[in-house]
């Protein structure tokens, strides 16, 4: 899958789930399941409920997302 195929959106973490998975409320009020990208995991970036994040969605499954950035 090429990087150009992803859809980037802003969202907010609602709750933490097991295995580094989170419920994310997108700016268009949809709720998706998001997991941390590998680079965020590698650099021990912590995410907690209420954080603003940027997620990448694929056009194939719009219910799952990859968290790629946490806003300060």
UniProtKB/Swiss-Prot annotation:
One of its GO terms (molecular function) is rRNA binding. Coiled coil: none annotated. One of its GO terms (cellular component) is cytosol. Keywords: Cytoplasm, Initiation factor, Protein biosynthesis, RNA-binding, rRNA-binding. It is found in: Cytoplasm. Pfam families: eIF-1a (PF01176). Signal peptide: none annotated. Residues 1-72 form the S1-like domain. InterPro entries: NA-bd_OB-fold, RNA-binding_domain_S1_IF1, TIF_IF1. One of the essential components for the initiation of protein synthesis. Stabilizes the binding of IF-2 and IF-3 on the 30S subunit to which N-formylmethionyl-tRNA(fMet) subsequently binds. Helps modulate mRNA selection, yielding the 30S pre-initiation complex (PIC). Upon addition of the 50S ribosomal subunit IF-1, IF-2 and IF-3 are released leaving the mature 70S translation initiation complex. HAMAP family: IF_1. Component of the 30S ribosomal translation pre-initiation complex which assembles on the 30S ribosome in the order IF-2 and IF-3, IF-1 and N-formylmethionyl-tRNA(fMet); mRNA recruitment can occur at any time during PIC assembly. Belongs to the IF-1 family. This is Translation initiation factor IF-1. It comes from Neisseria gonorrhoeae (strain ATCC 700825 / FA 1090).
């Amino acid at each position: 899958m090429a990087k150009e195929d992803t859809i980037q959106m802003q969202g907010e973490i609602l709750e933490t789930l097991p295995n580094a998975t989170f419920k994310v409320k997108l700016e268009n009020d949809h709720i998706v399941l998001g997991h941390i990208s590998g680079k965020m995991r590698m650099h021990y970036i912590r995410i907690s409920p209420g954080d603003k994040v940027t997620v990448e969605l694929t056009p194939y499954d719009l219910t799952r997302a990859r968290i790629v950035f946490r806003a300060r």
